[in-house]
């Protein structure tokens, strides 16, 4: 789906780090190194980015018209 704006646990903003994280990991960089360089140090925030699955393109086909 869409990346949450804030971490569910601590409330820190994580959405602004999604694009750089995603681009760098898709480019072949190590996710641990990327998160550290982006300043995501808490493990609760790290899991928000690591466990996110972008499935909005698949789900949009199953919505009903309003």
Curated annotation (Swiss-Prot):
Entry keyword set: Cytoplasm, DNA-directed RNA polymerase, Metal-binding, Nucleotidyltransferase, Transcription, Transferase, Zinc
Residues that hold Zn(2+) according to the record: 7, 10, 44-45
Cofactor comment: Binds 1 zinc ion.
GO MF annotation terms: DNA binding; DNA-directed RNA polymerase activity; zinc ion binding
Gene Ontology BP annotations: DNA-templated transcription
Classification via NCBIfam families: PRK04016.1 (NF003089)
Superkingdom, natural source: Archaea
Described purpose of this protein according to its UniProt entry: DNA-dependent RNA polymerase (RNAP) catalyzes the transcription of DNA into RNA using the four ribonucleoside triphosphates as substrates.
Gene3D superfamilies referenced in this protein's UniProt entry, alphabetically: Homeodomain-like
Location of the protein in the cell: Cytoplasm
EC primary class: transferase
Cellular-component GO terms for this entry: cytoplasm; DNA-directed RNA polymerase complex
Protein name: DNA-directed RNA polymerase subunit Rpo10
UniProt record similarity statement: Belongs to the archaeal Rpo10/eukaryotic RPB10 RNA polymerase subunit family.
Assembly, per entry: Part of the 13-subunit RNA polymerase complex.
EC number per UniProt: 2.7.7.6
Cofactor requirements of the protein: Zn(2+)
Catalytically driven reaction(s): RNA(n) + a ribonucleoside 5'-triphosphate = RNA(n+1) + diphosphate
């Amino acid at each position: 789906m869409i990346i949450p704006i804030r971490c569910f646990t601590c409330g820190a903003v994580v959405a602004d780090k999604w694009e750089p994280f995603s681009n760098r990991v898709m480019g072949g960089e190590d996710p641990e190194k990327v998160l550290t360089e982006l300043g995501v140090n808490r493990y609760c925030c790290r899991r928000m980015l690591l466990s996110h699955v972008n499935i909005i393109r698949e789900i949009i086909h199953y919505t009903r018209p309003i």
